[in-house]
Amino acid sequence: MKNNYTSLKSPLDEEDELKTDHEIDLEKGPLPEYDSEEEGALPPYSDHALVNNPPNTHRENNPSRSTDNSSPFLIKLLISFTPIYVLNVLAICYLTYKDAFFKDYGAAEWTLFGFWCLVCTLALIFLTYFYETWVKAVKVTVISLAKCVKVISIGLFNIRREMMIIIWILWLIICCILFVYIKSGDLILNKALICSTCTISAVLLLIVSSVCIPFWTFERTLAKLAKVLLLQSGIVLVLNGTMFLRGKHFERIGCEIEASVLFIMGNVLFLCEMECPGALIRTRNSIRNGIAFILGGIGNAMMGLANAIRGANDNNDIPLGEMDVESEV
């Protein structure tokens, strides 16, 4: 029985196959001669050949390049020697400051010096041998500390207003303790320093809290402090000027009272100004309006009194005949 096989390919498909058989792959180059008689031989571009013979990698093409990524020995030795060198420099500076660097050394001192050299040598060997371990530990520690500092900084920035008040209250307590010691006679300070305690406390507050306060808040704080200081300066000038014109001066108790009043007033005004911006301006306006109201009331009373007196005088100037006519009517 004959097998009648009819190809399903069209003439156009057969022409395409012939063209592709004669085309050259630009990436692989021309096909080498293939000997089908050799056993196990496969075409060089077959998938099986590519799996069995993978292409050379960059590392295989460059066998002379080292695959070890660890640091060279000299760099390890130098980095390991750095902390020991810094520690020895600090020790030398301390001994020089104490004037005891290689001066009047006896047997005990030289023995201690030799032991120190032995410890430094062993530490250098240990750090060099376990270089990767302690470097990794240092990196982890530094990263952890950096994260802690970042978290603390963010927390302080978020509570900067509360931190200002806490620092201010702490400094108030310190100043009150100062006053107690001065009053008991255990501490002698200049009265001018006592009078300017609020200034010192404000400056310390600004220095300490400037780390966690934005610049615009810092600038506003300076402006409010300047207002408080101007007000205090005016009060001090008025009081001392008045006493000077009268030929008198404050005794110790008077200076303490003045200092206490200025201290309490300055701190209260500064806190009020920080808590309620514009408190000093509103206080000034309120005082001015109050004085104006009082003066206006006094003026109105004087005007009413003047009108009453003028009305009484007008009645006294009426002729007697007119008064009789008015009475008859």
From Swiss-Prot:
GO annotation terms (biological process): meiotic drive
Region called Disordered, residue ranges: 1-68
Membrane topology (UniProt): Multi-pass membrane protein
Highest rank taxon of the organism: Eukaryota
Compartments reported by the entry: Spore membrane; Vacuole membrane
One Pfam family here: WTF
Any single Gene Ontology cellular-component annotation: cytoplasm
Assigned keywords, A-Z: Membrane, Transmembrane, Transmembrane helix, Vacuole
Ranges annotated as biased composition (Basic and acidic residues): 19-30
Sequence intervals crossing the membrane: 73-95, 110-132, 165-182, 192-214, 290-312
Keyword Transmembrane helix: yes
Subunit structure: Homomer. Interacts with other proteins that exhibit high sequence similarity.
The family this protein is said to belong to: Belongs to the WTF family.
Chain's role: Acts as a suppressor component of the dual wtf meiotic drive system, and can suppress but not confer meiotic drive by compatible poisons. Wtf meiotic drive systems promote unequal transmission of alleles from the parental zygote to progeny spores by encoding a poison and an antidote from the same locus; the poison is trans-acting and forms toxic aggregates in all spores within an ascus, wherease the antidote is spore-specific and targets aggregates for degradation by the vacuole.
The name this protein goes by in its record: Meiotic drive suppressor wtf21
Lineage, highest ranks first: Eukaryota, Fungi, Dikarya, Ascomycota, Taphrinomycotina
Chain's gene name: wtf21
